[in-house]
A protein has these predicted regions:
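Bacterial N-terminal signal peptides that target proteins for export
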Residues: 2-11
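Bacterial N-terminal signal peptides
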Residues: 12-20
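Sec/Tat signal peptide C-region and signal peptidase I cleavage site
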Residues: 23-27
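A contiguous strand-loop segment
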Residues: 28-145, 166-291, 296
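Glycine-rich, aromatic-lined ligand/substrate-binding cores of catalytic
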Residues: 246-361
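Substrate-recognition/cap regions that form aromatic- and gly/pro-loop-enriched pockets
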Residues: 329-454
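Histidine-centered catalytic/metal-binding microenvironments
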Residues: 430-492, 510
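Feature responds to low-complexity, polar/acidic, surface-exposed segments characteristic
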Residues: 490-504, 511-591, 597-627, 640-652, ...
Length: 667
């Protein structure tokens, strides 16, 4: 998934206003496993959706006829329109919130789902063509893109091939506004399609004996464009590439699609994902990390085992497992460490993931399951969604555009954040909780499937009621599990610590109960800290017996507050400078903190002598009463300057800075 405006920018069609827009990183990853390579004969295909994590994800059902013949679909992002030629089929999808902020793309982004004709669809894994082919066939400003295509395809497609043909016809008539990869499946076949430029595309019927991992680049190699049964292709696919002087052929004389339309080099974020995904599914693969090209269609190597659904689901949790690389979800961190830090498939930035499993023995109009997580599957269980459901839980369809404690997406995403804030301590145990639940579902599923298939053969309406009830039961169980994890993990981590410079000392302070969050989920590391908060933290570090300090020691100390006894302790032991007036709710300055820390260390018998003079460029701004204390603490390397050799004595302390200082004191 990605911002379609970026595609127009690359094509040279965007205005200068768009040039200044910040475009979020996109990193969707697709998977296909042919039925000959799976343990049970299932055909598997799906993707992760990675983009802006503040976009609420939902599971929504649409009854037959919800969209009427003649209704107009309008993509408010770019003006694309589609007139529905008939009433819509029944379908379900996984769209964004319909209440998104004005500064966010307002498209529907139905993303993935099944319809009642038995067609499973996901849209899209985005990709960039080369500049040369875009000049030859630019994107169309109001052309079709991922924000709208899933809606009309699920509403009307009656087969996987029919979905490809409908999308191809739409591109022929209206053009495309971005580069995309899509996959559609039904009981008989799975189709894979690459959309390259404004009017050029190629789709293939996916072979049953291959597997693929496809991040955000083009991967199709040689394609026989004359094979009408297995290939659907735009009419000018050869001419445009030749016009752009990028046309390439394979050794056996077939048009090389990625070579002709893709960029000259694979993006590093794609390289790390395709390589790790191939080696995950095929442990005996010899494909090197630095390969010039990665094939779309892969064989299982000799000695590698067939793939079951659990294995396929876990690919979307792969964090470069067993490799020499360090997984990193942070673009700046990867840029600073390009040789060691790589973008993994399993990422905190995944908004949702879906894997279709076309299964043997299922009805033609309901040919398989869609396994789903709303939020990243790293720490959220996969749930199987039956294709004929009538509804989802209130939590799963919660439309809130911001955090809501009753939202499946937001609660699960907060658990992912909490784990990422303290992955070393929480990652393994949380994952076990999640996979234990998935094991439970896997054990229940065969009997549920048997009952549902029997019902479906007799009464489709009752079968839909049954599958809806069971799916909602699992959704509710997952929501309750995630709520429990949220409550448990928030005691030892917070959701706003990911990639923060003080993450480790903050986690240490939380685990030792020296500091607490500003809410159940937030630590607010960059907020200023008050005098009362700082003294309370210091008192906890010193294991102060608060019962001894119940008597109020200063008229400015308010009784009955969390800090009352600790402030009394500080006043009695002269830990506060006179300038503070014992006002607990004022923000504390860096020089006052130095005075208080030095007084505390003297109180517990620490050596307060200094060995050398530490010079700060702004030392004239330091108050006389704090100068020696700052020297003492700088000598002990408990305190340092802020930047440019300045101490910034009058600046306020942040909660993160306090955690860092406390971690040094506690050693």
């Amino acid at each position: 998934m990605k911002n379609s405006k970026k595609r127009l920018l690359i094509a040279g069609l965007a205005s200068s206003m768009v040039l200044s827009m910040a475009v979020p990183t996109f990193a969707c990853t697709g998977i296909i496993v042919g039925k000959d390579l799976t343990t049970d004969g299932s055909f598997i295909f799906g993707r992760t959706e990675d983009y802006q994590r503040n976009r609420t994800m939902r599971l929504v059902t649409h009854p037959r006829g919800e969209i009427k013949k003649g209704d107009k679909l309008v993509d408010v992002n770019n003006g694309f329109t589609y007139i529905h030629k008939e009433d819509s089929l029944k379908f379900f999808s996984t769209p964004d919130s319909s209440k998104k902020p004005k500064d966010m793309e307002q498209g529907v982004y139905d993303a993935a789902g099944y319809n009642e004709a038995g067609v499973g669809i996901f849209c899209t894994v985005s990709a960039d063509p080369s500049d040369e082919v875009l000049k030859a066939d630019p994107f169309v400003k109001d052309g079709v893109n991922e924000a709208s295509m899933t809606t009309f395809l699920l509403a009307h497609a009656r087969s996987a091939r029919g979905a490809i043909e409908l999308l191809a016809q739409t591109i022929d008539e209206k053009g495309a506004s971005m580069g995309d990869i899509v996959a559609f499946g039904d009981q008989d076949e799975v189709w894979y399609m690459e959309i390259y430029t404004g009017h050029q595309y190629v789709a293939i019927k996916y072979p049953a004996d291959k597997f693929s991992i496809f991040p955000n680049d083009y991967w199709l190699g040689g394609v026989d464009l004359t094979d009408k049964e297995n290939v659907i292709v735009s009419k000018d696919i050869v001419e445009v590439a030749k016009k752009a002087k990028t046309y390439k052929e394979t050794a056996d004389g077939l048009m090389d699609m990625a070579g002709s339309y893709g960029p000259k080099e694979i993006a590093e974020t794609s390289r790390s994902r395709v390589w790790s995904g191939i080696h995950d599914l095929d442990p005996n693969s010899k494909v090197p990390y630095d390969a010039e090209r990665f094939d779309l269609l892969n064989d299982l190597s000799e000695g590698s085992e067939k793939i079951d659904i659990t294995h396929a689901l876990n690919v979307f949790r792969n964090r470069l497992d067993g490799s020499e690389f360090t997984p990193s979800d942070n673009k700046a961190e990867r840029k600073a460490n390009p040789k060691t830090h790589k973008r993994p498939i399993g990422s905190i930035n995944t908004m949702q993931a879906h894997i279709f499993q076309i299964k043997e023995g299922y009805p033609k109009e309901a040919p398989g399951l869609m396994w789903m997580t709303l939020g990243s599957p790293l720490n959220i269980p996969w749930v199987p969604i039956f294709p004929d459901i009538n509804d989802s839980t209130p939590e799963a369809k919660n439309n809130s555009p911001v955090y809501d404690p009753n939202s499946y997406y937001w609660v699960g995403s907060s658990v992912n954040d909490l784990v990422s804030g303290n992955r070393e301590a929480l990652g393994e145990s949380t994952r076990k909780t999640v996979t234990d639940f998935e094991d439970k579902i896997m054990k229940e599923l065969p009997q549920v499937e048997k009952e549902w298939i029997e019902l479906y053969s007799k009464d489709k309406a009752k079968a839909a009621e049954f599958s809806t009830a069971k799916t909602m039961e699992w959704e509710k169980e997952v929501f309750d599990l995630e709520k429990g994890l949220q409550k448990e993990l928030s005691q030892v981590s917070k959701a706003d610590l990911i990639d923060h410079w003080a993450r480790k000392p903050i986690i240490d302070a939380i685990s030792k109960k020296l500091m607490v969050g500003t809410s159940d989920l937030k630590f607010s590391p960059n907020e200023k800290i008050t005098r009362g908060e700082f003294i309370t933290i210091l008192g906890r570090l010193g294991k102060v017996d608060t019962k001894k300090y119940a008597e109020v020691k200063d008229k400015n100390i308010e009784a009955g507050k969390f800090y009352t006894e600790y402030m009394n302790w500080a006043v009695e032991n002269k830990l506060l400078p006179k300038t503070s007036k014992a006002l607990a709710n004022e923000n504390i300055t860096r020089e006052e903190m130095a005075y208080t820390l030095a007084a505390y260390l003297k109180l517990i018998g620490d050596d307060t002598s200094t060995q050398k003079l530490v010079v700060f460029d702004d030392e004239k701004e330091i108050s006389d009463w704090a100068y020696e204390d700052i020297q003492f603490l700088a000598n002990k390397e408990i305190l340092s300057g802020t930047s440019n050799n300045k101490f910034s004595p009058k600046a306020n302390l942040t909660r993160a800075e306090v955690a860092q200082i406390i971690s040094k004191l506690d050693k």
